[in-house]
């Protein structure tokens, strides 16, 4: 039961972009709607849990939320260019690499031979996985798709920076869990407004995309509940399984066309990235 509970964040987070695309709108209205949904749930949770809030927690949480908006908005821009099934494995891989390297450099993780071995293997798996999931169809090259791939990856670099700061700022100041949820959601809405207001995001699609925000906050809630039960490392590894849901959802629900060659490459790439997430989770416990 505890493991099933720990899988819920992956189910919730993996389905967010599928809802974003299905509900329609551009990346700006999608971003704004998602942040509003997250804020609604965070306010409700705050009144039930009533976590301790200090000025430090509030400021750090808002800064963290601002950068989450940067990450999410650019991830949705990339999806518009490359599709869900290509964007999400690459995005997940980039996030795992960046947060892992930051952990090693700043927080001195991977301090044991086992952790170093698993960590290096994980990074190799992620890089190979990203290459495989971004494999192009030979026929697409005539239609200018490689330029979309390049643009999409450049946008994902900005997205990864946003997600990295979102995670790292909270960790640097030891702000996490229930206390961070509401301040982060406020920061997300502020960031969403700043990033999107020039693009007239206030429309029916922004309202529709409140639903993915509710789902995102629900995933966070289940992550906080499951961590004490299964441990941070297991919870972290399982939460990365969302890549399976988003990628397969992109192919089978959103009907993104793939050749047999691409499907095989994507399947192998996903397996490698998931294995890397498991290795990183184990490395955390052996540091």
Curated annotation (Swiss-Prot):
Top-level lineage group: Bacteria
Compartment(s) of residence: Cell membrane
A GO term for molecular function: carbohydrate transmembrane transporter activity
Any Gene Ontology CC annotation: plasma membrane
Swiss-Prot/TrEMBL GO biological process terms: sporulation resulting in formation of a cellular spore
Membrane topology: Multi-pass membrane protein
Keyword Transmembrane: yes
One Pfam short name: Sugar_transport
UniProt entry tagged with the keyword Endoplasmic reticulum: no
Keywords: Cell membrane, Membrane, Sporulation, Sugar transport, Transmembrane, Transmembrane helix, Transport
CDD domains, A to Z: glucose_uptake_GlcU
Positions of transmembrane segments: 4-26, 38-60, 110-132, 153-175, 180-197, 210-227, 232-254, 261-283
Cross-referenced PANTHER family: TRANSMEMBRANE PROTEIN 144
Family classification: Belongs to the GRP transporter (TC 2.A.7.5) family.
Physiological role: Involved in the uptake of glucose.
Protein name per its UniProtKB record: Glucose uptake protein GlcU
Species per Swiss-Prot/TrEMBL record: Bacillus subtilis (strain 168)
Underlying gene: glcU
